[in-house]
Amino acid sequence: MSRFDESVNIYSDGHLLQVEYAQEAVRKGSTVGLRTKECVVLGVEKRAIDSLQIERTSRKIKKIDQHMAMTFAGLTADARVLVSRAQVEAQSHRLNFDRPASVEYITRYLARLKQTYTQSVARRPFGVSCLIGGFDEDGRPRLFQTDPSGIYYEWSANTTGRLGQTVNEYLEKNTAAISRTPDAASAMKHVVRALFTATSLDPASIELAVLRYWQPIEMVKPETLEYLLGVIKQEAVEEALTKAP
């Protein structure tokens, strides 16, 4: 890497190399988010933790406010900075306006912060892609994704990180079924099935959270994940038998 690659204002062919390096860091994990009429489900691939490690300190789904959560793919240390900044901004909004911040407001705040770091001297872009899900005051479910470059989009279902294209193929292939998802259980199954395409079928490697309107964020228990994985295994066997000549 030449010294020009490290500069924030020298580039060629429209490529910001530092941003592209940050995009590569995002490939260190996989996340999936799905929005239905009743809930928002966030799922993330995680490494198995040591038996002596406290589980809550390694979680990759973080609460931003009572009605909002965020998960991420990329550098965990960078993500913790963004989570902390988002939490402070959400609480500041409550104190100043006596109402919760909208999901898009926090997403815009994070996107603006990320974009600022692509133009700052002696700083590097955040190597994190975030999925932010939650509910607005009117009960509308929202799901947003931000990139290291600072751009953001809203989605009904999306994935970021490692094998993102493979997971997206599953989501696009099952768009009709996902759009008709009636409840949280069905939504959770779709998210776990999507993560299954990117990771081993093991409850210890998956973290799942469900957000509902005016309800506490639910972190899905390992027993529930075990049950969902059992259902998915059975469905996979049935599909294989159906396709067999």
Swiss-Prot record:
Give the matching Pfam families: Proteasome
GO biological process annotations for this chain's record? ubiquitin-dependent protein catabolic process
Supply the PROSITE patterns for this chain: PROTEASOME_ALPHA_1, PROTEASOME_ALPHA_2
Q: Where in the cell is it found?
A: Cytoplasm; Nucleus
Which regions form coiled coils? none
InterPro entries xref list: Ntn_hydrolases_N, Proteasome_alpha, Proteasome_alpha-type, Proteasome_asu_N, Proteasome_sua/b
Superkingdom of source: Eukaryota
Keyword presence, DNA damage: no
Give a brief account of the tissues where this protein occurs. Answer: Testis specific.
In terms of SUPFAM superfamilies, this protein maps to: N-terminal nucleophile aminohydrolases (Ntn hydrolases)
Question: One GO CC term of this entry?
Answer: nucleus
Keywords associated with the record: Cytoplasm, Nucleus, Proteasome
What family name appears in the similarity comment? Answer: Belongs to the peptidase T1A family.
State the protein's purpose: The proteasome is a multicatalytic proteinase complex which is characterized by its ability to cleave peptides with Arg, Phe, Tyr, Leu, and Glu adjacent to the leaving group at neutral or slightly basic pH. The proteasome has an ATP-dependent proteolytic activity.
Describe, as the record does, how this protein assembles with itself and its partners: The 26S proteasome consists of a 20S proteasome core and two 19S regulatory subunits. The 20S proteasome core is composed of 28 subunits that are arranged in four stacked rings, resulting in a barrel-shaped structure. The two end rings are each formed by seven alpha subunits, and the two central rings are each formed by seven beta subunits. The catalytic chamber with the active sites is on the inside of the barrel.
Protein name as catalogued:
Proteasome subunit alpha type-7-1B
Organism in which the protein naturally occurs = Drosophila virilis (Fruit fly)
* Name of the encoding gene: Pros28.1B
